[in-house]
Amino acid sequence: VVLFHYLAYKLVGKQVDHWCMTPDDLSFLSIATWKNTSIPIEADGNYSRCTMYDPPLPISQENRTAVPCHQWGYDIANKADSIVSRFDLVCDREYLYDLSEIVPLFGSGLVSPALGLVADHVGRRPVMLACAFTQLFATVANTFSETYPLFLFTRFLIFAATDVTFIATFTLLHEVTGNARRSTFTLIDIAVPHIFVPPLLHVISIVKPRWMLANALTIVTTGLLASWCWLVEESPTWLVATRDLRRAEVTVLLAARENGVDVAKARTTFKAIEGQLRRLDTCAMADPMEAIIETMKLRRRAASVLLARFVMDATYISLIMNDVTTGIRWEAAYVLSSVVCYASALGCMRSCGIRKTLSGVMVMASTFAVFEAMVMSRGEKVLTLYVHAGLKVFVSTGSGVTLCYTAETFPTVVRNAGICLSHFAGGMGCILGA
């Protein structure tokens, strides 16, 4: 759902050819006649998109003046199918198009850390539910928006709510999965959308769906997400970390019942763990120096996480939004290559650990980036496409491994806030990349 919103402009943000609109009193003129008669020719030989002659029709031998226009005609079957024509984001209003990309990214980056703190204090589930239904209502409002300010505001709500929902669900998945399978499930959670959503949207964009149909796809997926969030229980790991042991026991016993584990045995095991937790709390109070050392280590790891998220997100968003390797063959090659790369990364995470895997993936991505710069400087267009495709695969994989490393870096009591803070760094990178 996050990538559906991030890449929505592939469907509803198409650039549209435009020209100054024919006045009502000259509406009998064909578009070709109007352009030949009333639109200036630019230096490149094309008709001007933003100016027209005043007066529109020659009424004497005097020279006519080219003046800017404030209404436009568009080369699109339905004006409402692209935000460019829907809100007239052309000529002196063209900057509003870029603004509609930057404001949601920046706003989401600012809001996410605050909501992350809330999730660490009141729980993953309440924040996840609130944000899931917020993005559903905001998506519906965005679909029916008729003015640019409403569109921009609802898009900001969508980005903020969607990002926080994803972070909460990812954190929940990380916390309820055992150590043996954690790397598998968390990486798959990131790999599936990274691999399949960009090609899927490319295929959908080929058929040029109408505004309502394109948004209906997002509304349906968001509705399914909200329904799933409603059925999810609170993270027992967070409940234990915050010492809400009564609720933690209820959740653990429910999970035991759902997974066919003997409930009485699960209750006995939980009581034993509860006793160990009390002894650990006593030891922690007796040795405050150890807590200080752990805090210093956490700060160093957090700094590396923030830098990694900034770099990887900036590169990934830039590659996805300005992709040059488009077409069915390229998309199929991307899917196959990404599956192999993610599978290799998963194997490395199991055998070498997340940190070494992330370092290796970033080295490969950096190598491809340098190689692409070299072949581009030499004008090797065909080779550039292949190198670009490889870079996109490694950056996508690196983004996934970075998020897994982020979840491992922060302890449970501040994990959601830590991931959201790294998302802020990534959001700043996204703005740079966009």
Question: Where is each model-derived feature located?
Answer:
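Helix-breaking motifs and short loop linkers at transmembrane-helix boundaries and internal kinks
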Residues: 123, 144-149, 161, 178, ...
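Glycine-rich segments within core transmembrane alpha-helices of 12-TM secondary carriers
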Residues: 2-6, 105-111, 162-167, 171, ...
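Flexible cytoplasmic loops linking transmembrane helices in multi-pass membrane transporters
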Residues: 42-95, 257-326
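Structural signature of the two symmetry-related core transmembrane helices
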Residues: 126-141, 149, 192, 340, ...
